[in-house]
From Swiss-Prot:
Key words of the record: Electron transport, Heme, Iron, Membrane, Metal-binding, Mitochondrion, Mitochondrion inner membrane, Respiratory chain, Transmembrane, Transmembrane helix, Transport, Ubiquinone
Membrane topology: Multi-pass membrane protein
Function: Component of the ubiquinol-cytochrome c reductase complex (complex III or cytochrome b-c1 complex) that is part of the mitochondrial respiratory chain. The b-c1 complex mediates electron transfer from ubiquinol to cytochrome c. Contributes to the generation of a proton gradient across the mitochondrial membrane that is then used for ATP synthesis.
Taxonomic classification: Eukaryota, Metazoa, Chordata, Craniata, Vertebrata
Transmembrane segments: 33-53, 77-98, 113-133, 178-198, 226-246, 288-308, 320-340, 347-367
Protein name: Cytochrome b
Family matches, as PROSITE patterns: CYTB_CTER, CYTB_NTER
Length: 379
């Protein structure tokens, strides 16, 4: 009798994706983050669903409803903090996943990479709108500042902003639509993740060496299922430690003050995972220029495959490119730090230099270094 998992139409899809999938035998723990992102998404959708059962998207009651969830709902505090810190874990995994792709040349799978960039944009949009929902001070002013950036678009800018607001300022209409979008987007992200996997399974996984691994493939199950479970356990350990010991570590104290349009907080800043992009935005003294730099800071990832000048795929055997990669990581950490600092000397100049270096590394220095390494090997 033929095996059901190989013949049943639904089981066959699962089998070919997670059980009998031919996988390179040498992929390291850096390849765990795809499954971790899947787990993060599931956790976010489930906790978000339970939060939505008690949340009200009205300016008068939004803040109170979140307080009610934390105080009166059974384990509401746990659900709320799992959701808030789950977002942080999501972004940590995302950044590591993208970093892995850059280091090992996974971006050479064009379709997979481009869907990934689209996913990054979608997750960032979802997180931004979710941050607005508790209707604290930072929620309100963050929404005001970021949506206002669209007014920099020539000709249609101011009309566009009022259209998004649903009025002349961030108000009830804005909150209601942000809640609607925040609810629907994770399901769109899940669908996109399915397409991401579909394209990945067309080519098969990359591996640390960047070489073709067709001659040495092993089944995904049990080897990588057990490896993924280890990663998932570590993720759960870190997330629960964060939630149970210091749930507000990554949050902003200002968000425990109800939104007040008449009182601006001294330092408006987004969640930590947006600080690098926020620093790039602030480093340009022109509004439109800043908005373009902000968008390009993520969109530049889509250009990376076309700037690959090396004869080798991975950075595993390219020491000079490795140095530049780690400089890029340090630069992003610097930008993250600057994004949380006030706009004053010396932070302004540090932010501007770090922003220039960010684009310079990706667009100029890395491709030139790759060409230099080709000559070094006399290829």
């Amino acid at each position: 009798m033929t095996n059901l998992r190989k013949t049943h139409p639904l089981m066959k899809i699962i089998n070919n994706s997670f059980i009998d999938l031919p996988t390179p035998s040498n992929i390291s723990s850096w390849w765990n983050f795809g499954s971790l992102l899947g787990i993060c998404l599931i956790v976010q959708i489930l906790t978000g669903l339970f939060l939505a059962m008690h949340y009200t998207s009205d300016t008068m009651t939004a803040f109170s409803s979140v307080t009610h969830i934390c105080r009166d709902v059974n384990y509401g505090w746990l659900i709320r903090y799992l959701h808030a810190n789950g977002a942080s874990m999501f972004f940590i995994c995302l950044f590591l996943h993208v970093g892995r792709g850059l280091y090992y040349g996974s971006y050479m799978f064009l379709e997979t990479w481009n869907i990934g960039v689209l996913l990054l944009f979608a997750v960032m949009a979802t997180a931004f709108m979710g941050y607005v929902l508790p209707w604290g001070q930072m929620s309100f002013w963050g929404a005001t500042v970021i949506t206002n950036l669209l007014s920099a678009i020539p000709y249609i800018g101011s009309d566009l902003v009022e259209w998004i607001w649903g009025g002349f300022s961030v108000d009830k209409a804005t909150l209601t639509r942000f809640f609607a979008f925040h609810f629907i987007l994770p399901f769109i992200i899940a669908a996109l993740a399915g397409v991401h996997l579909l394209f990945l399974h067309e080519t098969g996984s990359n591996n640390p060496s960047g070489l073709c691994s067709d001659a040495d493939k092993i089944p995904f199950h049990p080897y990588y299922t057990i490896k993924d479970i280890l990663g998932i356990l570590l993720l759960i350990l870190i997330l629960t430690s964060l939630v149970l010991f210091s749930p507000d570590l990554l949050g902003d104290p200002d968000n425990y003050t109800p939104a007040n349009p008449l009182n601006t907080p001294p330092h408006i800043k987004p969640e930590w995972y947006f600080l690098f992009a926020y620093a790039i935005l602030r480093s340009i003294p022109n509004k439109l220029g800043g908005v373009l730099a902000l968008v390009l800071s993520i969109l530049v990832l889509a250009v990376v495959p076309f700037l690959h000048t090396s004869k080798q795929r991975s950075m595993m055997f390219r020491p000079f490119s490795q140095c530049l990669f780690w400089i890029l990581v340090a630069d992003l950490l610097t930008l993250t730090w600057i994004g949380g600092q006030p706009v004053e000397h010396p932070f302004i100049i540090i932010g501007q230099l770090a922003s220039i270096l960010y684009f310079l590394l990706i667009l100029v220095l890395m491709p030139i270094t790759s060409l230099f390494e080709n000559n070094l090997l006399k290829w």
